[in-house]
Amino acid sequence: MACWEKGGQVIESQLESEYLKKPLEYRVYLPPCYAEQPERRYPVLYLIHGQTYRNDHWLNLGAADLVDRLAATGEMAPFLMVFPYDRDHYISPPENGFGEAIVADLIPAIDTEFRTLPERADRAIGGISRGGNWAVHIGLQHPEIFGALGAHSTPIFSSDTNPEIAKWLEAIPLERLPRIFMDAGENDRWLQYTLIFEDLLNTENIPHEWHLYPGYHDDDYWQAHLEEYLRWYASPWRESH
């Protein structure tokens, strides 16, 4: 089909939220053939950028091009990606209402405007560095919404102490635990803080996938592992969709 050769489309938009002082800006990646297959519905992956970056971070790493290629060859089921912008990137929760805005406002807007599969099994959240903090913070507090979360080179928020995260984990029924993927570079300057969360998951006997690779806390590292990330998120999503 010719539409697979054209690649996907990225749309920029914004919405108002009572949880934020300014509009929430976001980008949406629509996979190849989205317009040409109006009967089809898609899983959604929410991806959050690193601190001091903008919501084109994952796109600049090559996320859209990679999904274009893998979906066109049939190696991966196509899916939507949503990239929200954490404008107040030096403020952590609960003072920063970014997480609440995603859950209360952005997800309903995406499910209304686009042809999504609005079930937790077809929705995942992940992030790089600070963005991974948000993925943990949002994903563990809303296991009814997300079936998977990824934390890439992620030191936890100082406000999300071990007892607080442990409470979230203990409150999740076993059948509602999201799939969890974590990774970091051996020379990551924040590695000791990433290991805090990884150690907690081990202490709580929470199933998760953990990788420690050569590399630093930088774009070269994340770009080198981008395909692994996206394949992991999409692994439960089949072409039957």
Model regions and ranges:
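Non-catalytic cap/lid and distal C-terminal segments of serine-dependent acyl enzymes
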Residues: 1-241
